[in-house]
Regions:
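Conserved N-terminal subdomain of the carbohydrate kinase-like
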Residues: 48-102
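Glycine-rich phosphate/adenosyl-contacting loop at the front of the ribokinase-like
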Residues: 1-56, 65
Protein backbone atom coordinates (compact mmCIF):
# COMPACT_ATOMS: atom_id res chain seq x y z
CA UNK A 1 0.00 0.00 0.00
CA UNK A 2 1.22 3.48 -0.85
CA UNK A 3 0.59 6.36 1.53
CA UNK A 4 0.88 9.96 0.37
CA UNK A 5 1.48 12.74 2.87
CA UNK A 6 0.39 16.33 2.29
CA UNK A 7 1.58 18.63 5.05
CA UNK A 8 -0.03 21.72 3.53
CA UNK A 9 -3.10 20.69 1.51
CA UNK A 10 -5.16 23.32 -0.26
CA UNK A 11 -8.24 24.06 -2.26
CA UNK A 12 -7.58 25.74 -5.59
CA UNK A 13 -10.30 28.29 -6.38
CA UNK A 14 -10.22 29.50 -9.98
CA UNK A 15 -12.45 32.51 -10.63
CA UNK A 16 -13.35 32.94 -14.28
CA UNK A 17 -14.20 36.43 -15.54
CA UNK A 18 -14.47 38.06 -18.96
CA UNK A 19 -12.33 41.04 -17.99
CA UNK A 20 -10.44 42.35 -14.99
CA UNK A 21 -10.47 46.06 -14.24
CA UNK A 22 -9.11 47.91 -11.19
CA UNK A 23 -11.33 49.79 -8.72
CA UNK A 24 -14.62 48.20 -9.80
CA UNK A 25 -16.55 45.05 -8.96
CA UNK A 26 -15.49 42.40 -11.47
CA UNK A 27 -18.31 39.88 -11.91
CA UNK A 28 -17.43 36.23 -12.28
CA UNK A 29 -18.71 34.11 -15.15
CA UNK A 30 -17.97 30.84 -13.36
CA UNK A 31 -15.59 29.24 -10.89
CA UNK A 32 -13.78 25.94 -10.33
CA UNK A 33 -12.84 24.29 -7.04
CA UNK A 34 -10.29 21.50 -6.79
CA UNK A 35 -8.61 19.69 -3.90
CA UNK A 36 -4.86 20.28 -4.17
CA UNK A 37 -1.49 19.76 -2.54
CA UNK A 38 1.52 17.69 -3.63
CA UNK A 39 0.46 14.45 -1.94
CA UNK A 40 -3.21 14.93 -2.82
CA UNK A 41 -2.27 15.33 -6.49
CA UNK A 42 -0.08 12.21 -6.35
CA UNK A 43 -3.01 10.28 -4.85
CA UNK A 44 -5.26 11.35 -7.74
CA UNK A 45 -2.65 10.26 -10.30
CA UNK A 46 -2.01 6.93 -8.57
CA UNK A 47 -5.75 6.22 -8.56
CA UNK A 48 -5.99 7.03 -12.29
CA UNK A 49 -3.18 4.51 -12.82
CA UNK A 50 -5.16 1.88 -10.90
CA UNK A 51 -2.85 1.97 -7.88
CA UNK A 52 -4.63 1.93 -4.53
CA UNK A 53 -3.30 4.43 -2.01
CA UNK A 54 -4.18 6.30 1.16
CA UNK A 55 -3.95 10.10 1.26
CA UNK A 56 -2.78 11.46 4.61
CA UNK A 57 -1.64 14.77 5.97
CA UNK A 58 -2.57 17.64 8.24
CA UNK A 59 -5.44 20.08 7.75
CA UNK A 60 -8.55 21.54 9.23
CA UNK A 61 -11.84 23.32 8.91
CA UNK A 62 -14.43 23.20 6.17
CA UNK A 63 -11.62 23.27 3.64
CA UNK A 64 -10.22 19.93 4.79
CA UNK A 65 -13.77 18.55 4.68
CA UNK A 66 -13.94 19.59 1.02
CA UNK A 67 -10.57 17.97 0.27
CA UNK A 68 -11.42 14.67 1.95
CA UNK A 69 -14.84 14.61 0.25
CA UNK A 70 -13.10 15.06 -3.12
CA UNK A 71 -10.73 12.20 -2.38
CA UNK A 72 -13.54 9.94 -1.18
CA UNK A 73 -15.60 10.77 -4.28
CA UNK A 74 -12.74 9.47 -6.43
CA UNK A 75 -12.48 6.30 -4.32
CA UNK A 76 -9.29 7.31 -2.51
CA UNK A 77 -9.02 6.34 1.16
CA UNK A 78 -7.83 9.18 3.35
CA UNK A 79 -6.85 9.76 6.95
CA UNK A 80 -5.85 13.32 7.81
CA UNK A 81 -4.81 14.67 11.20
CA UNK A 82 -7.37 17.39 11.90
CA UNK A 83 -6.23 20.67 13.40
CA UNK A 84 -8.25 23.70 14.48
CA UNK A 85 -7.06 26.10 11.78
CA UNK A 86 -8.63 25.84 8.32
CA UNK A 87 -6.64 24.53 5.40
CA UNK A 88 -5.49 27.17 2.90
CA UNK A 89 -7.27 28.28 -0.24
CA UNK A 90 -5.27 29.31 -3.32
CA UNK A 91 -7.13 31.85 -5.47
CA UNK A 92 -6.51 32.27 -9.19
CA UNK A 93 -8.30 34.60 -11.60
CA UNK A 94 -8.67 33.50 -15.22
CA UNK A 95 -9.40 36.52 -17.44
CA UNK A 96 -10.98 35.36 -20.67
CA UNK A 97 -10.49 38.46 -22.84
CA UNK A 98 -6.76 38.54 -21.99
CA UNK A 99 -6.29 34.76 -22.09
CA UNK A 100 -4.33 35.17 -18.82
CA UNK A 101 -4.42 33.64 -15.37
CA UNK A 102 -3.33 35.52 -12.25
Amino acid sequence: MIYTITLNPAIDLVIITKKLEPNIVNRTENFELQPNGKGVNVSFILKKMGIENVATGIGGGFTLDYITAGLTEKGISNNFLKVKEPTRINVFTRVLDQNQEY
